Amino acid sequence: MIEGVGVDIVAVERIKKIYEKCGEKFLNKVFTEGEISYSFSHANPFPHLAARFAVKEAVIKALKKQKGLTLKNIEVRNNSDGSPEVKIPGFNKKIFISISHEKNYAVAFVVIT
């Protein structure tokens, strides 16, 4: 049974501008060490940061603003086959995600069962 659905779109340039203004403070407030490391392993980290930000926002929408949920404790990482997955401490439901980024935008779609 589907318990929640969420979608979000993020302008890559928006994430870049926030980073240029706030730097590490922004990164450390929103992203895990793994997400930061993964994103900055690419020549242009901003599409990857934007995609992860979009997933976090879509998860929050799907969970209808569950108490105690923050952007930072929603972690997007790649599993053994390279596909993205979401990990939330203490959360046991299945989270399906789809992420895409192309030039100016990143989008994420989340289904929770």
Curated annotation (Swiss-Prot):
It catalyses: apo-[ACP] + CoA = holo-[ACP] + adenosine 3',5'-bisphosphate + H(+). NCBIfam families: acpS, pantethn_trn. This is Holo-[acyl-carrier-protein] synthase. It holds the Pfam family ACPS. The gene is acpS. It is found in: Cytoplasm. Keywords: Cytoplasm, Fatty acid biosynthesis, Fatty acid metabolism, Lipid biosynthesis, Lipid metabolism, Magnesium, Metal-binding, Transferase. One of its GO terms (cellular component) is cytoplasm. One of its GO terms (molecular function) is magnesium ion binding. Belongs to the P-Pant transferase superfamily. AcpS family. It comes from the Bacteria. Its cofactor is Mg(2+). It comes from Thermodesulfovibrio yellowstonii (strain ATCC 51303 / DSM 11347 / YP87). Transfers the 4'-phosphopantetheine moiety from coenzyme A to a Ser of acyl-carrier-protein. InterPro entries: 4-PPantetheinyl_Trfase_dom (IPR008278), 4-PPantetheinyl_Trfase_dom_sf (IPR037143), ACPS (IPR002582), Ppantetheine-prot_Trfase_dom (IPR004568). Mg(2+) binds at residues 8, 57. Its EC number is 2.7.8.7. GO terms for biological process: fatty acid biosynthetic process. It is an enzyme of class 2 (transferase).
